[in-house]
UniProtKB/Swiss-Prot annotation:
GO terms for cellular component: membrane; nucleoplasm; plasma membrane. This is Leukotriene B4 receptor 2. Belongs to the G-protein coupled receptor 1 family. It comes from Mus musculus (Mouse). The gene is Ltb4r2. Residues 46-60, 118-140, 207-224, 297-360 are cytoplasmic. Low-affinity receptor for leukotrienes including leukotriene B4. Mediates chemotaxis of granulocytes and macrophages. The response is mediated via G-proteins that activate a phosphatidylinositol-calcium second messenger system.
Length: 360
């Protein structure tokens, strides 16, 4: 692509020293936290083969760690780019690296949306628990996620260009192309997935708070986890997509107007906001550690598998134990399981019933 639309001012990704410094710091911190964190998640879940089959949630978390880890492996390239103010690879490398980044971005947000939908169904439709454990369903969902990510990431490679042999950044043939590409990326990679996450967790929290144990310790723990996931997702991706929208509006504005000049500012700020989005790939393992609570000292390195074993979805045996947490959120079943030796499917231990619910 020989001719590129450029906003007034001719700013590039490297124009602002502050954005470069912020971006470098976020990238280094993301790699420091995210590479070992996601590696640990892959190590914990990849070889875990419970008798009843790996829970769908665990499979989604595994692929989320793979997607996040893949993009974090590219951080040395971006650190070199920002610190040396020159792209270390050529034109082909420019397109290929940003394609992998976009692929990881779409896979991560789609997997996050699926994970929130799975949790919502597990709470509101517990009778679907056997189907949610189906390996065939997991394979179909994952195939759909990765195929969709492969297709949605194509524009990131098409519109990347090496400017002056030094700067790898977006290159659109016209303002209309720029506005369409940036708006579509924000719609498919933020607005729709984030809306799904918010909707699913809103329904989940409403259902859990309606349960008798929803105001206790587990209600607080689940509420904090949900809030952390949604807050991290929104805060870390919002600046990147705000720049997208700013540049999309600026591209369609009159060339001499103030909005058009804001497009150049957005271009210069993109290095920092992109690095902040990278940081989102390192947050999930940290959230898993905080979610584990007292499982961490008791289960040690295997706390993650114990966390999913306690979710009820991983349990084998009788069908009455499928979706244990979800079924026991209803007031009626909660009363039935309060006493010892009363025929409770979990073995007649009321304390164990409460403990199982709290481990979800």
């Amino acid at each position: 692509m020989s001719v590129c639309y450029r906003p007034p001012g001719n700013e590039t990704l490297l124009s602002w020293k502050g954005s470069r410094a912020t971006g470098t710091a976020f990238l280094l911190l993301a790699a420091l936290l995210g590479l070992p964190g996601n590696g640990f998640v892959v190590w914990s879940l990849a070889g875990w083969r419970p008798t009843a089959g790996r829970p769908l949630a665990a499979t989604l978390v595994l692929h989320l760690a793979l997607a996040d880890g893949a993009v974090l492996l590219l951080t040395p390239l971006f650190v070199a780019f920002l610190s040396q103010e020159a792209w270390p690879l050529g034109q082909v490398g420019c397109k290929a690296v940003y394609y992998v980044c976009a692929l990881s971005m779409y896979a991560s947000v789609l997997l996050t949306g699926l994970l929130s939908l799975q949790r919502c169904l597990a709470v509101t439709r517990p009778f679907l628990a056997p189907r949610l454990r189906s390996p065939a369903l997991a394979r179909r969902l994952l195939l759909g996620v990765w195929l969709a990510a492969l297709v949605l990431a194509v524009p990131a490679a098409v519109y990347r260009h090496l400017w002056g042999g030094r700067v790898c950044q977006l290159c659109h043939p016209s303002p209309v192309h720029a506005a369409a590409h940036l708006s579509l990326e924000t719609l498919t990679a933020f607005v729709l997935p984030f809306g799904t996450v918010l909707g699913c967790y809103g329904v989940t929290l409403a259902r859990l708070r309606g349960a008798r144990w929803g105001s206790g310790r587990q209600g607080t723990r689940v509420g904090r986890l949900v809030s952390a996931i949604v807050l991290a997702f929104g805060l870390l991706w919002a600046p990147y997509h705000a720049v997208n929208l700013l540049q999309a509006v600026a591209a369609l504005a009159p060339p001499e107007g103030p909005l058009a000049r804001l497009g150049g500012a957005g271009q210069a700020a993109r290095a920092g906001t992109t690095a902040l989005a990278f940081f989102s790939s390192s947050v999930n393992p940290v959230l898993y550690v905080f979610t584990a609570g007292d499982l961490l000292p008791r289960a040690g390195p295997r706390f993650l598998t114990r966390l999913f074993e306690g979710s009820g979805e991983a349990r084998g045996g009788s069908r009455s134990r499928e979706g244990t947490m979800e079924l026991r959120t209803t007031p009626k079943l909660k009363v039935m399981g309060q006493g010892r030796g009363n025929g409770d499917p979990g073995g007649g231990d009321g304390g164990k019933t409460e403990k199982d619910s709290q481990e979800w």
